[in-house]
């Protein structure tokens, strides 16, 4: 077959050898349509055909599309972005396009190696953000030939997975014990650490705050081969702060304070302590006369019951759990009486589990806890927060916190708690014959014909 390429519109026509004469007539035929085409550029080799700035290159028995080397080099010259990552990605794109041009690909890799040795790219490479495309990956991309294990072994032989840049000290040793001790830069610091570990803890108040300036991040050693100035690191807690002191000594253990990051909910006084919760669980287990496996089922049922009915201290009687279609009743007295400080503070330990349970129910069918139904909560996305022992934490979304606050305000509206009721031994001698209707303002005032009571 013979191919003919028309420059400009990149049209490739192929005909059999005996039909080459067709090319001689095509120019006139296209001219009748007002198109000026030249079909003089002809070839019998696929490698000499160009289409959309690409030519076919035979590699391992497969024709692959290749750009001109000059166009690939222009990709390397692309440097318009402010992001260093974009520059490295452009180089990787040039690697992909250059596969097949062995010499050009080798030069691109040398250029990439030189670029990564520059100061502005060193940090990028050290953090593992500098991309690279191996020869095996390029061959797989173009030929779809899987990589053999022996080819990957070549990479494993030159990689040191235990090496971390900048993690080791370089120590020069000479003969003589005294010289070695002088050159051991880390010995003194190790000795000080050992002495600190053997020192009694109660030697003085606030011993961890003797030198507050050392409690921050230890600055890295300055490399003698580096240029420029080292960027300073700020201390998290410094002696410039107004810290509590007694007798001129800081009473805080700053070393411990920097590492003291407890779970926030463990400090909430709205949640029962772990000891109180364990005591409640053990007491309920004894009074119900159940084992741990049975208590697991009971706790599931009681948590779901509390989601719908709340954890008010005034609950009494029985709570129910479903066994298929059958209701099984359990007395509330052991659960309420042993709940210290309150039942709601005990149930705060179930907050995350209850939230996940509501979310699971909603994934199967619409489910809104009774607590949310009573407050007329209309947004089903907030159903997971619609129970009165939900524990508000720093992770709770702002919209959910607002909904929880409004539901609590609605639940507490109109409540008037009285310490004492009417003494049963006192009786009144007068009979109240006053008659009121539903339209009256209050029990002491008749209707005002539409006027409300004074505010």
Curated annotation (Swiss-Prot):
<dbReference type="GO" id="GO:0003968">
    <property type="term" value="F:RNA-directed RNA polymerase activity"/>
</dbReference>
<comment type="similarity">
    <text>Belongs to the potyviridae genome polyprotein family.</text>
</comment>
<dbReference type="Pfam" id="PF00767">
    <property type="entry name" value="Poty_coat"/>
</dbReference>
<protein>
    <recommendedName>
        <fullName>Genome polyprotein</fullName>
        <ecNumber>2.7.7.48</ecNumber>
    </recommendedName>
</protein>
<feature type="region of interest" description="Disordered">
    <location>
        <begin position="182"/>
        <end position="225"/>
    </location>
</feature>
<dbReference type="InterPro" id="IPR001205">
    <property type="entry name" value="RNA-dir_pol_C"/>
</dbReference>
<dbReference type="InterPro" id="IPR043502">
    <property type="entry name" value="DNA/RNA_pol_sf"/>
</dbReference>
<keyword id="KW-0167">Capsid protein</keyword>
<keyword id="KW-0808">Transferase</keyword>
<keyword id="KW-0946">Virion</keyword>
<dbReference type="InterPro" id="IPR001592">
    <property type="entry name" value="Poty_coat"/>
</dbReference>
<feature type="active site" description="For nuclear inclusion protein A activity">
    <location>
        <position position="5"/>
    </location>
</feature>
<dbReference type="GO" id="GO:0006351">
    <property type="term" value="P:DNA-templated transcription"/>
</dbReference>
<feature type="compositionally biased region" description="Basic and acidic residues">
    <location>
        <begin position="182"/>
        <end position="198"/>
    </location>
</feature>
<keyword id="KW-0693">Viral RNA replication</keyword>
<feature type="site" description="Cleavage; by NIa-pro">
    <location>
        <begin position="174"/>
        <end position="175"/>
    </location>
</feature>
<dbReference type="GO" id="GO:0019028">
    <property type="term" value="C:viral capsid"/>
</dbReference>
<keyword id="KW-0548">Nucleotidyltransferase</keyword>
<dbReference type="GO" id="GO:0003723">
    <property type="term" value="F:RNA binding"/>
</dbReference>
<keyword id="KW-0696">RNA-directed RNA polymerase</keyword>
<dbReference type="Pfam" id="PF00680">
    <property type="entry name" value="RdRP_1"/>
</dbReference>
């Amino acid at each position: 077959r013979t191919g003919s390429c028309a420059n400009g519109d990149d049209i490739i026509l192929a005909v059999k050898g005996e039909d080459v004469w067709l090319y001689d007539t095509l120019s006139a035929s296209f001219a009748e349509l007002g198109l000026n085409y030249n079909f003089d550029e002809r070839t019998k080799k696929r490698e000499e055909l160009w289409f959309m700035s690409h030519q076919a290159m035979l590699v391992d028995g497969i024709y692959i599309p290749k750009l001109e080397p000059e166009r690939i080099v222009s990709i390397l010259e692309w440097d318009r972005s402010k992001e260093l990552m974009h520059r490295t990605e452009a180089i990787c794109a040039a690697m992909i396009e250059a596969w097949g041009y062995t010499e050009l690909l080798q030069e691109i890799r040398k250029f990439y190696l030189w670029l990564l040795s520059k100061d502005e790219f060193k940090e990028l490479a050290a953090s593992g953000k500098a991309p690279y495309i191996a020869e095996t990956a390029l061959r797989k991309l173009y030929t779809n030939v899987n990589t053999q294990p022996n080819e990957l072994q070549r990479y494993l032989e030159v990689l040191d997975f235990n090496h971390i840049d900048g993690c080791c000290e370089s120590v020069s040793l000479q003969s003589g014990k005294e010289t070695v001790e002088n050159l051991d830069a880390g010995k003194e610091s190790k000795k000080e650490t050992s002495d600190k570990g053997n020192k009694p803890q109660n030697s003085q108040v606030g011993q961890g705050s003797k030198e507050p300036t050392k409690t921050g991040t230890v600055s890295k050693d300055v490399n003698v081969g580096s240029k420029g100035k080292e960027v300073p690191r700020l201390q998290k807690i410094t002696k410039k702060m107004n810290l509590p002191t007694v007798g001129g000594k800081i009473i805080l253990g700053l070393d411990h304070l920097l590492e003291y990051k407890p779970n926030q909910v463990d400090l909430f006084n709205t949640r029962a302590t772990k000891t109180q919760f364990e005591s409640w669980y053990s007491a309920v287990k004894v009074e119900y006369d159940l084992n741990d496996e049975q208590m697991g089922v009971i706790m599931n049922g009681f948590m779901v019951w509390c989601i719908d009915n709340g954890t008010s201290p005034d609950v009494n009687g029985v709570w129910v759990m479903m066994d298929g279609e059958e209701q099984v009743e359990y007395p509330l007295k052991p659960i309420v009486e042993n709940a210290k400080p309150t039942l709601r503070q005990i149930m705060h330990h179930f907050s995350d589990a209850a939230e996940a349970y509501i979310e699971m129910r909603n994934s199967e069918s619409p489910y809104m806890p009774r607590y949310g139904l009573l407050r007329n909560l209309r947004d089903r996305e907030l159903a997971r927060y619609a129970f009165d022992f939900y524990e508000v934490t720093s992770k709770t979304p702002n919209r959910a916190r607002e909904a929880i606050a409004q539901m609590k305000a609605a639940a507490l509206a109109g409540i008037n708690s009285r310490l004492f009721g009417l003494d049963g031994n006192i009786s009144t001698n007068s009979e109240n014959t006053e008659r009121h209707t539903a339209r009256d303002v209050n029990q002491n005032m008749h209707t005002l014909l539409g006027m409300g009571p004074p505010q």
